[in-house]
């Protein structure tokens, strides 16, 4: 209610789609995982989140190794997702094959799939905490190798922000730098 005249529209989509919307001036800004240089888009690193394994059956403990994850049924996003790319890279480096039993983009569908106990998912810590609470499940930090994703604020490179968009950006930056943020939920990117 700090800015009652501003309406925020949230779009959940891949970084590529969001960047395209920025370039075409359909969005003022986007917060995405794992930015890559894109012509026409400026990017500012915000945070880094560790990746966690989330499930409801047979908790592996506070931390889990990729070798153990290779034995589990996985629900992962499609192969263009930053999470999927990071998981595929970790498995490839260890010459392991992931047992992907479903590719799920929707949080509601992923929540139902994890609640069913049929498999586990790899998620950034903030999403893992939320999903874990929703399904009364567990979360384990992926430690060998440790995996994380950086979160970036992307803006159109050649456009000035409207006063409303600038206010939203400033509010976002103040929330990110706030000492009130839950310990270990977010880590500043160095």
Task: Describe the predicted segments one by one.
Residues 11-12, 76-77, 103, 121, ...:
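Active-site-adjacent beta-strand anchor residues
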Residues 3-9, 97-101, 150-152:
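Residues at or immediately flanking beta-strands
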Residues 40-79:
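Flexible hinge/capping segments at coil-to-helix
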Residues 7, 21, 25-26, 45, ...:
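Conserved functional loop/turn residues at catalytic and ligand-binding sites
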Residues 73-94, 161-165, 169, 175-187:
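Secondary-structure junction motif
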Residues 1-4, 96, 143, 184:
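Proline-centered flexible-loop/turn and helix-kink motifs
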